[in-house]
């Protein structure tokens, strides 16, 4: 099958591309390279350097002729969404609308969308949180990603297409940007290996559900291989880990005895987040297979190799 991946030069998108290629699919990538890297795109893949809001998008999709579109491209920083909600909405909402309109004109019948899990549900006492829990996003990022979900549902209803939203937990692994604010594991790994202090926002007892990048790529690949599966499915491990515990594990792996520093909590960030992925197992046969300890070891090893390069 021909698959078009938006954001395929980025952290999550590049892992998705690798998995789709391994499964034998022909892959095209759209990426504006704002945060993605050209060198992450394999030679067997056609890279179209294009923003989803660009007028050239019609021609790019027409050239790719995809049977399925996997929409990963996004503005993913919560803090930037708080500082500049208009930009966040422009990328995550208007960019998605533009893509869906082009898909409609090109006759694309299948879209798989990677949305957010924790930022969608906000603070909740129902943990792990299932898909039918009310959406209570506490940040513009959560609002924009869940709004895009609604447009995807509308596109499917109007065109007869099949749309599947995967609400991702906190994704981590090789290739994550340690200079960004969305990946605490990448940030801690990079700084610990460099001998720099690490800053924990708030008291560090906030929890997250950390899911390894290859597990996420596997979920997307299963979605591509299951064209009749529609709706929404959480992609997470079902396990909560505090930021303090995360730091302790990474400090042990890197041989660092220094304690983390603490700063103020970030606006728009929820206290606890962990996803119920029962539906993903039922619909896609998917469960996370990489444990946190294994994933952290692989991630630290990758950052060590990057430092040597």
Could you describe each region identified by the protein language model?
Residues 140, 148, 181, 243, ...:
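Conserved donor sugar-nucleotide recognition element shared by glycan-biosynthetic enzymes
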Residues 147, 151, 155, 188, ...:
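Hydrophobic alpha-helix immediately C-terminal to the catalytic Tyr-X-X-X-Lys motif of short-chain
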Residues 1-171, 214:
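N-terminal Rossmann-like NAD(P)+-binding domain of SDR-like oxidoreductases, especially those catalyzing
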Residues 35, 174, 237:
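Short, conserved catalytic or interaction motifs in soluble domains
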Residues 41, 53, 177-181, 239, ...:
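Residue-level signature of the cytosolic catalytic core of signaling kinases
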Residues 190-309:
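C-terminal substrate-binding subdomain of Rossmann-fold SDR/epimerase-dehydratase oxidoreductases
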